[in-house]
Amino acid sequence: MNFVGAQAASTPNVIIIMADDQGYQDLGCFGSPKIKTPQIDRMAKEGMRFTDFYSGASVCTPSRASLLTGCYASRVGNLGVLFPRDKRGLNPNEITIADLLKAKGYATACIGKWHLGHLKEFLPTSQGFDTYFGVPYSNDMTIDVSQPLANDIVLREGVTLENIKNRVKKNLVPLMRDTEIIESPADQNTLTKRYTE
């Protein structure tokens, strides 16, 4: 999940990058001798680098809830991983860092994996983000057939509306723009490139 904020030149840009299963030394700027991360290294050199931090949880949903709200996951009711069949998510009444930055005039965007609820009321655009482009949960999950599909949805790898509705295939994590599914399954080969364009 990436968070991007921008305002006047006198106000700093804010970019928060959260990666699943990343170790402390998996980036060049934190000492990795093997993994090359020149763009992130440059951002760390030109910006602020945090060296003492703790994850709010060991799995996706609660760690993301903690990062965005500044609260323990148990306090905001997100104790375990959410699945496509779940009808819950991060409570829209929780105040997120995106809400706080937006109140200060920042433009906000969430790009990448969300995993805090896929129903409209839980998506990033209901949590302080102006826009969202990404996958609503883990790459190995499927699609919730109750979600709205874009009129111009791109169906790939032999996927049809019929087998989506009948849950014939797994690993159909969709790509979303704001509150609509725009591609199913998300093209994992081009996803990173599209996130950064």
Language-model region placement:
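Formylglycine-dependent sulfatase
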Residues: 1-197
